[in-house]
């Protein structure tokens, strides 16, 4: 079974697409920064700004639960999936083809 080309997938999917799928709403936003409630530990307040996302680098960090990573790791963590399963699931949800890696 061929693997997933995670690097190519990270280049194809923006973290903003993942935030949209998760139903996340920004409390504050400028051109490259997005802040709002954390979808990982599910912030109690809708006005929370503990979850910080760099839209340019596709990286996130929660200042409360310390969760951090890229767009694929965010999907995996919030959906409680392995990275491989998260990649497949995310591609299906976004209607994208899974980039395959044939390296063993």
Task: Show where each model-derived region lies.
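N-terminal structured subdomain of primase-like DNA metabolism proteins
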Residues: 1-104
């Amino acid at each position: 079974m061929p693997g997933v080309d995670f690097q190519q997938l990270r280049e194809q999917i923006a973290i903003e697409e993942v935030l949209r799928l998760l139903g996340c709403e920004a409390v504050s936003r400028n051109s490259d920064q997005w802040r709002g409630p954390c979808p990982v530990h599910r912030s109690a307040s809708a006005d929370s700004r503990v979850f910080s996302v760099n839209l340019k680098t596709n990286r996130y960090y929660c200042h409360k639960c310390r969760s951090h990573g890229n767009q694929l790791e965010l999907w995996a963590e919030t959906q409680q999936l392995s990275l491989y399963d998260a990649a497949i699931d995310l591609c299906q949800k976004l209607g994208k083809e899974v980039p395959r890696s044939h390296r063993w």
